[in-house]
Amino acid sequence: MNTSSLTDIFQNAVQAPTQEVVKEEVVITKEATPDNLVYQMVSFASYLYQLNIQAHLLHFNVECSNFLAVHKFLGKQYQQHLADFDTISELVRSMDFLMPMCQCGLFDAFKKFPAVKTYDAREGLTLYTKNLEAGAMMAKDLVDAAKETGAPDVENFAAEICGNLFKGAWMLKATLRGSM
C-alpha cells in the first residue's frame, strides 16, 4: 500500500483524463398561462374569503373606545371582501375553470392565512391591517399576471380590489394611531 501526500493526490486528480459531463440546469419559471393565472386567482379568492371571516369576527368581537365607528367600518369591510371574493370567483368561472366545492378545498387554496388569536382590539386590528396590505400585494401580483396572460378583465378587477384593500389598511392605520 502506497502512502501519498495530499498534494500528490490532487496533482494526480488534475492530470487524470476527464470526460465531459453534461449537467441539466432546471429553472423554475412562472409562465404566463391561463392555468397559472387561474391558480393564482383561486388562491387570492381563498385569501379574500378568509379576510371576510376575519373582518366579520372582529366586527362582532372588537371592544374599544371608538366601538361604533370601528364596528361600522368592519361591517363595510367584510361586505366588500365578500363582494371581491364573488367577483374573483366569477372571473374564474368565466374562464371555464371550477372553484373549490367545499370550505376545506377553498381554505386549502391559501393555507397560511394569519389568524387573530386574541380579543385585544389593538392586536386584532393590527393583524387585520397587515392582512389587508398582504392581500393588496397579492392583488398587485395578480394584476401583473393578468397583464402578461392577456386577461384585461382580471387585471382591472384585481386593480380595483387592490385599491379597496390598501384604502382599508390606511383607514385602520389612522384609527390605530389616533385613539386606541
Where are these regions (language model features)?
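Short linear clamp-binding motif
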Residues: 1-17
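Acidic, proline-/serine-/threonine-rich low-complexity intrinsically disordered repeat tracts
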Residues: 14-32
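Conserved alpha-helical segments that form or flank metal/cofactor-binding pockets of metalloenzymes
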Residues: 68-105
